[in-house]
Design a protein with these regions (language model features):
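A residue-level detector for the "anchor" residue at the start of short, highly conserved motifs
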Residues: 4-23, 29-252
């Protein structure tokens, strides 16, 4: 005998919900149409859902994650990169007489020769070391913190706090393998990260769902399917709304 597989019907939104979704999408669409002056004026930028591998003039490598922006300034005395937005992984060529600096928000990283990741978004900066040593200066300490293999530092401008942790190699810049590793993160925070990889908009309509916690490895090459798989056990659903719009809500 054939087995019938039930599939949940798409959720029907009320007229009020549709009005809210439409207004939010329209506002976001207007914002998206505005010129991205930060990206236009920067030395390097990467488009949505693409990485960009850059060989710098000293032979060092900078890999930009999706929707990331960076400025580069080298002179005879020092090498300096400013990560304005997003995430980057650096493989730095050692030059003992010319230090390599990465600026991200209020954090400054000093390097001689090493491999490490930096991210900056909404006032939060994270630094993770895959090999070698870096010195990280934050506003919370008079002296730089020395980070070695596996060390992870995060600084939040919101509460002016610096936190240290140990990370395994697979947790350092997993976006290089098109993975997002979420460990006890809120649905809202995961959606914020997925927006970097999803063309268009992701709208969260349920505040309670946004506060639920996720631990999962998500495939960044298919953000919609990855998000659906992650929130389905929590009673969430992802639906197509207006063109280039995903609507995240509690399941019917």
């Amino acid at each position: 005998p054939q087995v019938a597989v039930a599939t949940p019907a798409p959720r029907r939104f009320s007229r009020r919900q549709y009005s809210w979704i439409g207004a939010a999408a329209a506002a976001c669409a207007v914002f998206m149409l505005l010129p991205d002056w930060q990206a236009l004026q920067a030395d390097y930028r990467s488009p949505t859902a693409e990485h960009r591998d850059i060989t710098l003039s000293d032979g060092s490598h900078m890999l930009l994650d999706s929707n990331s922006v960076a400025d580069v300034h080298f002179d005879p005395e020092q090498r300096q990169v400013t990560l304005l937005r997003g995430q980057a992984f650096f493989s730095v060529k050692s030059e003992p007489d010319r230090a390599f600096f990465v600026n991200a928000g209020q954090v400054r990283v000093r390097v001689t020769g090493t491999a490490f990741a930096v991210s900056v978004e909404n006032g939060e900066v994270q630094v993770s070391v895959e090999s070698g040593t870096v010195a990280v200066k934050t506003p919370t300490a008079p002296e730089p913190a020395s980070l070695h293999h596996g060390d992870h530092l995060s600084y939040s401008a919101a509460d002016n706090q610096t936190r240290l942790a140990q990370w395994p190699n697979e947790s350092i810049a997993p976006w290089r393998r098109w993975q997002l590793v979420a460990v006890d993160q809120s649905v809202e925070d995961v959606i914020k990260q997925l927006r970097r990889y999803q063309p268009g908009l992701i709208l969260l309509t349920d505040k309670a769902l946004g506060q639920r916690r996720i631990t999962a490895a998500l495939n960044l090459r298919d953000p919609k399917r990855a998000l659906q798989a992650a929130i389905a056990p929590l009673g969430g659903a992802v639906q197509d709304g207006l063109p280039y719009t995903l609507i995240v809500t509690d399941a019917p």
